[in-house]
Amino acid sequence: MDMQNENERLMVFEHARKVAEATYVKNPLDAENLTRWAGALLELSQFQTEPKQMILEAILKLGEALVIDPKKHDALWLIGNAHLSFGFLSSDQTEASDNFEKASQFFQLAVEEQPESELYRKSLTLASKAPELHTGGTAGPSSNSAKTMKQKKTSEFKYDVFGWVILASYVVAWISFANSQTPVSRQ
């Protein structure tokens, strides 16, 4: 059953990506469409063995959206998520730190644009903790078993955080996709 849900998610986001791509051909200056496209790419990246390329593509689409509408809070938040995800996937500490810093900057801008968003504020808090999570925390107990336990907890926490970021991205992308599919009322 879980595999069926995964396949359905894959199909939904692949469809959203194709729709956004077709819409882009008609109107390349639609910031909302670019944001939906990037959200779909971020979700699809979860199904890739090498997700970094798809995340970079999402970052480019979000960059385009922000050139069109620099105050688009959901695009600011999504690009922050993309950088956060990219940082966690990076084995190079400098590259990871750079991406965590960019994520923090974009989350801060999203908070400034929509200060009432608890999700944006929590994302900003998470981004500030990302470097420590990425390195596995600071040196702690001298006992090997205690150290192993701490690493396991840190690793589990890292995956929990990454899961919540992905879930939040999924919710935003789904809402954006649903909003784009609502019929226009005629008056």
Curated annotation (Swiss-Prot):
UniProt TPR repeat ranges: 84-117
Modification N-acetylmethionine occurs at: 1
Intervals, Cytoplasmic compartment: 1-160
Transmembrane segments: 161-178
Induction annotation: Up-regulated after antimycin A or rotenone treatments.
Subcellular location: Mitochondrion outer membrane
Molecular function per GO: protein-transporting ATPase activity
Alphabetical list of Pfam families matching this protein: TOM20_plant
Keyword ATP-binding on entry: no
Record motif AKR2A-binding sequence (ABS) required for mitochondrion outer membrane targeting, residues: 179-187
Membrane-topology descriptor: Single-pass membrane protein
Mitochondrial intermembrane side stretches: 179-187
Family of this protein: Belongs to the Tom20 family.
Subunit and interaction comment: Forms part of the preprotein translocase complex of the outer mitochondrial membrane (TOM complex) which consists of at least 6 different proteins (TOM5, TOM6, TOM7, TOM20, TOM22/TOM9 and TOM40). Interacts with a variety of mitochondrial precursor proteins. Interacts with AKR2A. Component of a mitochondrial large protein complex that contains, at least, MIC60, DGS1, TOM40, TOM20 proteins, and petC/RISP.
Note: There are four genes (TOM20-1, TOM20-2, TOM20-3 and TOM20-4) which encode mitochondrial import receptor subunits TOM20. In mammals and fungi, the transmembrane domain is located at the N-terminus while it is located at the C-terminus in plants. The overall orientation of the protein in the membrane is therefore inverted.
Official protein name in the record: Mitochondrial import receptor subunit TOM20-4
Species per Swiss-Prot/TrEMBL record: Arabidopsis thaliana
Lineage, opening ranks: Eukaryota, Viridiplantae, Streptophyta, Embryophyta, Tracheophyta
